[in-house]
Amino acid sequence: MRTDWTRDEIAALIALPFPELMFRAQSVHRARFDPTEIQISTLLSIKTGGCPEDCAYCPQSAKHEDGGVKASRLMAVEAVLKEARAARDAGAARFCMGAAWRSPKDHDLETVCAMVEGVKSLGMETCVTLGMLDDRQAHRLREAGLDYYNHNLDTSPEHYGSIISTRTYQERLDTLAHVRDAGINVCCGGIVGMGENDDDRAGLIASLASLPRHPESVPINLLVRVAGTPLAGADPVDPIDFVRIIAAARIAMPASRVRLAAGREDMTDEAQTLCFLAGANSIFYGEKLLTTPNPEASRDARLLARLGMHTSLAQA
């Protein structure tokens, strides 16, 4: 499987005539996956707000005081397990937990490890996103049984400095290396709609597809424009352009789960359907993604029923 994709190659894919691009993406998708299957995951914010980072898209940053998010303490383990049971009963096979930290403190990491162990005991796969990790922390999470660690690249290396100044691109790559070395599956993607150009979008997919090993899960987010954040006034993304990014991700990373993440609340059913045709085969289920709205579970169920698609047990 190729891990040497170039930006120019990805840009050429994205620029293909739409029918040709969709045909190629669907062909790649069918070679590895059941095209009628969608994986369901649930995401819970276990520690919200107060983050010292300055990510321009994120209302959880303490630097964006008008973002409308009040800082909270880390949730208790049993409260998290209650949410996990509800997610399992609603059909989720993977439970993802996110904490608004630059990096976790050791005592907080131990609490998260207890959460991981508890969720695993419910028969669910686990994923956490806690910010930057060192090698020791990654191995501790693996000891607890963690299946996946999410740490996104967000955008291209060139556009990155326009979005974040408190964490470097290399620091993100270093965390991903620690996660891989610990034997944890990688969940890594980015965000579309942050003022980037077409070349940046190709650069994001090329960066993901040229990692030493393709991420097992690739969440592609559509920017949720939150009042009070620097990107609140960003231009909306053409739905067809977004579908093109999904298709390019599927072609370049044929064995990865490509996940529709944040921004689905603003997508029409028709736009989501095109994303599924382009190779997206995973969604987040539930009314919120960390602090932003997500489609109601009933809307998702109705759409999947209309399309004759079914949900699956989590595997990537």
UniProtKB/Swiss-Prot annotation:
Segments forming domain Radical SAM core: 36-264
SUPFAM superfamilies (UniProt xref): Radical SAM enzymes (SSF102114)
Keywords: 2Fe-2S, 4Fe-4S, Biotin biosynthesis, Iron, Iron-sulfur, Metal-binding, S-adenosyl-L-methionine, Transferase
Pathways involved: Cofactor biosynthesis; biotin biosynthesis; biotin from 7,8-diaminononanoate: step 2/2
Domain of life the protein comes from: Bacteria
UniProt-listed Enzyme Commission number(s): 2.8.1.6
MF (Gene Ontology): 2 iron, 2 sulfur cluster binding; 4 iron, 4 sulfur cluster binding; biotin synthase activity; iron ion binding
Chain ranges passing through the membrane: none
Key word Kinase present: no
Binding site for [2Fe-2S] cluster: 96, 127, 187, 259
Cofactor(s) this protein cannot do without: [4Fe-4S] cluster; [2Fe-2S] cluster
Family designation: Belongs to the radical SAM superfamily. Biotin synthase family.
HAMAP family listed in its UniProt record: BioB
Known role: Catalyzes the conversion of dethiobiotin (DTB) to biotin by the insertion of a sulfur atom into dethiobiotin via a radical-based mechanism.
Quaternary organization: Homodimer.
Entry protein name: Biotin synthase
UniProt source species: Gluconacetobacter diazotrophicus (strain ATCC 49037 / DSM 5601 / CCUG 37298 / CIP 103539 / LMG 7603 / PAl5)
